[in-house]
Amino acid sequence: MLRIFHNTKYEFVRWWRVAAGLTLAFIAAGFVSFAVTGGVNYSIEFTGGTLMQLQFKTPPDVAEVRSALDAAGIQGAEIQQFGANTDFTIRARDEKQVEAQDAGAEGISRQITAALDAKFGAGTVTIVRTEAVGPKVGAELRTGAAMAMLIASIFTLIYLAIRFDWRFGLAAVLSTTHDILITLAFIKIFHIEVSLTVVAAILTLVGYSANDTIIIFDRVRENLKKPHKGETLSHILDRSINETLPRSIMTHTTTFSATLALLLLAGEVIRPFAWVMAFGVVMATFSSIYVAGPLLLWIEGRWPRLDDAATARAVRAGEAATTTARGTDRVSAR
């Protein structure tokens, strides 16, 4: 595979408009989903409540399970079958009940167990797992998750500004922000429940995306130091991406294979993490090639390093002329 992508000369940067259109369309679909169906589907860890994973001896009727809970005063509980037809999860998120549980009153889990024993008989239901989170803890976890992503972005910007240049840092952070937004859109569109493991996946992708962008930008910096007479910044970006392409292909293929194994073989609890990681790895690869480079090109054109304004305008004119020349060459080739 390394030899296949050796000494390639693909023109990546010129496809930035197509890449921007695709990503904006996907992010817009996510915003529409937010507007139509409401906010993110948070897990018990963020909303507060009780989650119980149950196993019945014989497959029950979901309507009977719900009627048993309603009779016990547990209104609005979410009942979901997963895996075998005897395995169910019950999520109780009623605010008054959660507050009562947080205050030390009888736990909702006990009420659920008693209600099901009364309906189906004692010993017919086995409790596999129980999670209970108070409303205050859930709010603190939501705030902490948001702060973690914000702090990660800030430190990435600071590191790149010191290591490279603030223009590189800004391009990398904007590219990483793109990855976060498009991953959130994916989570919303496909109704993935946001738990602590999903937040961990998003934070992992922040570092993964930034790392891949840094590798390409490091090669750009090296190529800028070399004699590059007649080469525009877009040419240097294309050359740098092509030079790091074998490494990118091997790294991303390995990482995606690991997440794919999790997706296919892991259980229901870890599967949302695997979905987000698999999608995020693909998007991190895409953004490091088609988003970070064009963003750097735009930033360098908007705030050039050159002190002479006339020279800076000449550089931007040269970029435009190069784009026009490429288009003319393609027409001539036809």
Swiss-Prot record:
GO terms for biological process: intracellular protein transmembrane transport; protein targeting; protein transport by the Sec complex. It is a multi-pass membrane protein. The keyword Metal-binding does not apply. Keywords: Cell inner membrane, Cell membrane, Membrane, Protein transport, Translocation, Transmembrane, Transmembrane helix, Transport. Gene3D superfamilies: Multidrug efflux transporter AcrB transmembrane domain (1.20.1640.10). Its main location: membrane. The keyword Nucleotide-binding does not apply. It holds the Pfam family Sec_GG. It is found in: Cell inner membrane. One of its GO terms (molecular function) is protein-transporting ATPase activity. The chain crosses the membrane at residues 18-38, 144-164, 168-190, 195-217, 258-278, 279-299. One of its GO terms (cellular component) is plasma membrane. Belongs to the SecD/SecF family. SecF subfamily. Forms a complex with SecD. Part of the essential Sec protein translocation apparatus which comprises SecA, SecYEG and auxiliary proteins SecDF. Other proteins may also be involved. Part of the Sec protein translocase complex. Interacts with the SecYEG preprotein conducting channel. SecDF uses the proton motive force (PMF) to complete protein translocation after the ATP-dependent function of SecA. This is Protein translocase subunit SecF. It comes from Gemmatimonas aurantiaca (strain DSM 14586 / JCM 11422 / NBRC 100505 / T-27).
